[in-house]
A protein has these predicted regions:
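C-terminal-most transmembrane helix of multi-pass membrane proteins
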Residues: 1-3, 44, 52, 217, ...
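Glycine-/small-residue-enriched transmembrane alpha-helix faces in small-molecule transporters
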Residues: 1-38, 77, 81, 85, ...
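Hydrophobic alpha-helical transmembrane segments of multi-pass integral membrane proteins
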Residues: 7-12, 38-53, 123-133, 152-156, ...
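Loop-to-transmembrane-helix transition segments
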Residues: 8-17, 60-86, 128, 152-160, ...
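Helix-helix packing/entry segments at the starts of transmembrane helices
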Residues: 17, 40-42, 84, 98-104, ...
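Specific transmembrane alpha-helical segments of multi-pass solute transporters/efflux pumps
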Residues: 23-24, 52-102, 135-137, 219, ...
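C-terminal transmembrane-helix exit sites in multi-pass transporters
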Residues: 50-59, 105-129, 257-276
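Hydrophobic transmembrane alpha-helices of multi-pass small-molecule transport proteins
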Residues: 51, 73, 120-142, 195, ...
Length: 297
């Protein structure tokens, strides 16, 4: 069976979403052994180094060393901020919440687009209201529905969505202009290296202390390096090159669903009624903001 390039791209993005969804659980469990800064730094360094070992098999050519370096540095920096703030949030929120709050980056993408002369579609405003309502319900405790129920961990993950949205814009440009495989490798190494330098300088006593790291902690680190970094992000790069922005964002939004499924299977995380309604509203809001601009009335 021969698939069209678009179908291949959608399959790659779906696999990436499943893999990303599966990594929220080990990201959560690994916090028993690692600090958020340690885990994020080594996760991307290891992933980048593993991929670098395959670079000799790539025939991609770099047309402009300057452009490649600048975009890779910028992408690596934004990726470091996105991954670290998300990981800090995962320490004190659930894997399920982290998955759905991360998906809010889809709402932020249009606002980032304003800086590159893209106008906002009216659908963004009802989507924000729906997702805000969903966020309050998702963080609710029992019958208590209040903004005060949104934890610091939830806020950190929501904050990370801003950087994920910026990173998506950078990647959207990079996949059209740069050799994707080499770009992926360099941005991962830059991301991990920047966090390593930061940790070594400003938190050296804790960052370089591995006495509490167990074999299971090492396993979860390597799983996230291989799964999230080597497989997930790399498939995203190649998938986005073959698929238009809207279907790509829709497919990647399913990451939240897979995160909830894996959290239920492995961690027995179960949403209460308010949580289920909230998660559904967030997902619907994310889907609506992508589909509405395509509907002709």
């Amino acid at each position: 069976m021969v698939f069209s390039s678009k179908t291949r791209g959608l399959i790659l993005l779906l696999i990436a979403s499943i893999v990303w969804g599966s990594t929220f659980v080990p990201q959560k469990i690994a916090m028993q052994d690692w600090s958020a800064l340690q885990f994020t730094s080594f996760r991307f360094l290891i992933g980048g180094i593993i991929l670098f070992s395959f670079i000799k098999f790539s025939s991609e050519k770099i047309k402009s060393n300057f452009e490649f370096l600048i975009i890779s540095l910028l992408s690596g920096l934004v990726l470091a901020l996105a991954a670290l703030t998300q990981q800090i949030g995962i320490v004190t929120t659930t894997a399920t919440n982290a998955g759905f709050y991360t998906s809010l980056y889809v709402l932020i993408v249009p606002f980032i687009g304003l800086f590159i002369s893209k106008s906002l579609h009216w659908s963004i405003w009802p989507s924000i209201i729906v997702c805000f309502t969903g966020s309050v319900l998702l963080s609710s405790s029992g019958d208590s529905i209040s903004l005060s129920n949104i934890s610091n961990g939830d806020l950190w993950v929501i904050f990370s969505a801003i950087f994920w949205a910026i990173h998506l814009h950078i990647v959207s440009y990079a996949v059209l202009k740069l050799p994707i495989f080499k770009f992926s490798i360099i941005q991962f190494i830059i991301c991990g290296f920047l966090l390593f330098i930061y940790g070594s300088i400003f938190d050296s006593q804790n960052f370089l202390n591995f006495t509490n790291v167990s074999s299971s902690g090492i396993f979860y680190l390597f799983y996230c390096s291989l799964g999230s970094v080597c497989i997930g992000f790399t498939l995203q790069m190649f998938g986005q090159r073959l698929v238009e922005a809207t279907p790509a964002a829709l497919i990647m939004s399913t990451e939240a669903i897979f995160a909830a499924i894996f959290a239920w299977i492995i961690l027995s995380e179960v949403l209460n009624f308010n949580g289920l309604v909230g998660a559904s509203l967030i997902f619907l809001g994310v889907i609506f903001v992508q589909l509405a601009p395509k509907v002709k009335i």
